From Swiss-Prot:
Organism: Bacillus licheniformis (strain ATCC 14580 / DSM 13 / JCM 2505 / CCUG 7422 / NBRC 12200 / NCIMB 9375 / NCTC 10341 / NRRL NRS-1264 / Gibson 46)
Family: Belongs to the RecO family.
Gene Ontology biological process terms, A to Z: DNA recombination; double-strand break repair
Name the UniProt record assigns to this protein: DNA repair protein RecO
UniProt entry keywords in alphabetical sequence: DNA damage, DNA recombination, DNA repair
One GO location term (cellular component): bacterial nucleoid
Gene3D superfamilies from the UniProt entry: Nucleic acid-binding proteins, Recombination protein O, C-terminal domain
SUPFAM superfamilies named in the record: ArfGap/RecO-like zinc finger, Nucleic acid-binding proteins
Top-level taxon in the UniProt lineage: Bacteria
Transmembrane segments: none
InterPro entries membership: ARFGAP/RecO, DNA_rep/recomb_RecO_N, NA-bd_OB-fold, RecO, RecO_C
Signal peptide: none
Amino acid sequence: MLTKCEGIVLRTNDYGETNKIITLLTREHGKIGVLARGAKKPNSRLSAISQPFLYASFLFRKSSGLGTLEQGEMIESMRNIREDLFLTAYAAYIAELIDKGTEEKKPNPFLFELLLQSMRRLNDGTDPDIIANLIEVKMLSVMGLYPELDECVHCKSKDGTFHFSIRDNGFICHRCFAKDPYRIPLSPASARLLRLFFYFDLSRLGNVSVKQETKDELKRVIQTYYDEYSGIYLKSRRFMEQMDNMKKMLGDENKS
């Protein structure tokens, strides 16, 4: 049976000499895999729509296992991402996170819109660190993880200075600091952003300017939390970190 849907290319894998298996996140069907015959050939009609991060309309032949891609029509190429190595690193990380954090053939329109908005924001020049952090935090509930970000995990206080307790799964206020000597320090700005990322709709995000110190705090908390609770390993994380370090080095050289 032929099925038409909109989807975003999460990843591609070579299959044989000329074919590709394309993993798509679709609004209607969730995450699916389709076989694109001949897509490795440069002149193939399926080659252009088999590119990572592409947003397109796909026509495929559905089956109980792997579907077969018949044709497609590009909606948005996300060209700026694919032409920029730094943006490619962030997009690959976000795509792999959503890929690893979701099951196949389970429709999730929220997740589809989240991925689409994140790719659009990266493509349009929004700070990639902020986009990556926001997606990381948004994905927690998708994976069944719910850190306490509204009040202190111990005394339930909603005011004061908050740090983050990995052990106790959430914010810990200054009155309870002694209960976790290994808590991760947070500035008020970082605490606000963590809460904002968890609840805020990405489509409403404007131009955000965040200090590097705040970014570093967010990165430490989020990555430590993922390492402790998520149970997933992302190959693209190392690539993203390498690109991030390279960007910082280039920035330091330009200042000197």
